[in-house]
Amino acid sequence: MQITRVLLLPFSLLALCGSAQTLSITHARVIDTITGQIRRDTTVVIDGNRIARIDPSSKSVPKAAKIINAHGQYLIPGLWDMHTHVYFDRTAADGDDLILPLFIANGITGIRDMGSKLDAVLNARDGVASHRLFGPRMIVSGPMLDGPKSQYKAAIPITTPEDGRKAVDLLKNRGVNFIKVQSGVPREAYFAIADESKRVGIPFEGHVPDAIRASEAISSGQRTFEHLIGIFEASSPDETGYLTGKKSPGLFLASYDPAREATIIELLAKQHVWQCPTLYWERGQWLVDVIDYSKDPDLAYAAHTWVDKLWPQSQQSILKSLDTDPVAIRERFVSHELDVVRKLHTAGVPFLAGTDTPAGVDVIPGISLHLELQRFVAAGFTPLQALQTATLNPAQFYNKLDEYGTIQAGRLADLLLLKANPLTDIANTRSITAVIADGRYLSQGDLNRLRSRLRRSAVMK
């Protein structure tokens, strides 16, 4: 019976949100994610999965519309998590039944998946698009390209340049949206991957591999840097040694050179290389022995196998790699990361909000994106700028400003209603009263029922 309940969950969730319809959200406070201005007492009319028009609430609404009175509430675009691994190393059912619905339950209506099993993630992307599966819009890489000794199940091991070219061709032909490179890709294979990606017309993004300088990744056309990898190495006179040697927070801090840091920041800004720093995940990695996830108030949404097995295993594995750096050094490095993000932002380097969920300890899908926005504010972003990393910026990154990222007529109807203003406190992005995903409306009651089902699903995983 337990198996039957799990398998039936996606179908019951689809029934929960119904289909797109004509909606009129009246008396809302609509936040402009470009300027930060708020249009008060505004009606947003949705027809199907598109915003049809935006008017003062004094104007009449379509007679057939379902009316949602949003008096006193704030309307923002749906959020994007730009670094996820939905089908990373467990069964497809975990992604279908728990991870994807958790995104919607927390207002994440779009994700960039940075490494998952190929068939599972392609099926999910297409299933969500056709409303056969309950979840956010998905931009996917399929499996990562990693080195010959990759530890990941959702990776293609690469040894030679020819391996790299073949992998790019395979993934391009299967229909992935971009290529993800991991840290272990060998040097010559990396350049082959970059060259082949350009040749076949597919973006490549991800880690700056251990064998590659940040400047080389930039000149090769790598579109994003994840986790700030490459920047710390480039900020040190020991950068060449880091290509083949050990790295650690203590070593990075000891060899830090502000002038070299300024040089790499200037280059990143000039070439407009997007950064997805995963700050919440980073803090959890470096302080894994300090943070007590058992006290997380949202722990009920984490699969019990994550909590009981995977997270303790990850803790031990991470601690083994950190045994030479005391907590005080690692705390300094976490602060240093925030300072680097502040400098990058001041220089005009563009940012995307991402979490690496469900990889990492206590990085719960959906919930962690809100915590990531709070880390951006801790790094010196205004609440509006932090909000932009999960709304406006993903749309700019994909050249889709005509589709999402703002609330305007003609845009896709991916929206959140909030009780409180996120521009005064970014934590208010969690005060969700309704989610509209591809035109499908989930009320507060629907969300409460969804979250209850997901807590039950987490127990069974």
Which role does the model predict for each range below?
Residues V30-T43, P56-S57, S335, I364, ...:
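Acidic, glycine-enriched loop/beta-strand segments at the rims
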Residues L170-V185, I231-A379, R455-K461:
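Active-site neighborhoods of metal-dependent hydrolases
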Residues I99-D119, G135-P143, L170-V185, I202-E205, ...:
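Divalent metal-dependent hydrolysis catalytic cores, especially in the metallo-beta-lactamase
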Residues V30, I34-I76:
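Histidine-rich, glycine-flanked metal-binding segment
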Residues L7-A15:
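Bacterial N-terminal signal peptides
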Residues G18-T22:
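Boundary at the C-terminal end of the N-terminal hydrophobic targeting segment
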Residues Q73-R132, P148-Y152, I156-E162, E188, ...:
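Metal-associated gating/positioning segment near the N- to mid-region
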Residues A28, V44, N49, G72, ...:
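Divalent metal-coordination and catalytic microenvironments
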